[in-house]
From Swiss-Prot:
Keywords on record: Ribonucleoprotein, Ribosomal protein
Molecular function per GO: structural constituent of ribosome
Pfam families in alphabetical order: Ribosomal_L32p
Gene Ontology cellular component annotations, sorted alphabetically: large ribosomal subunit
Sequence similarity: Belongs to the bacterial ribosomal protein bL32 family.
Organism: Rhodobacter capsulatus (Rhodopseudomonas capsulata)
Gene field: rpmF
Protein name per its UniProtKB record: Large ribosomal subunit protein bL32
Example of a GO biological process term: translation
Length: 68
């Protein structure tokens, strides 16, 4: 069974963990629809990136009409 050869001190443990912090998100507004999106990513609301539509949006289906 593997066990540590030497005890890891609090200082060494904390120095190792110094780079593990999470970075807060920095959302930007989409120039096409105004929704918040991640920088350098396609907008999830409208599918635009760099003033072009790169992901076609599916037509919305009204479930109330199809149920009857």
């Amino acid at each position: 069974m593997a066990v540590p050869q030497n005890r890891v001190t609090r200082s060494r443990r904390n120095m190792r963990r110094a780079h593990d912090a999470l970075v807060a998100a920095n959302p930007a507004s989409c120039p096409n629809c105004g929704e918040l999106k991640r920088p350098h990513h396609v907008c999830g609301a409208c599918g635009h990136y760099d003033d072009r539509e790169v992901v076609a949006q599916a037509a919305e289906v009204d479930l109330d009409d199809d149920a009857a």
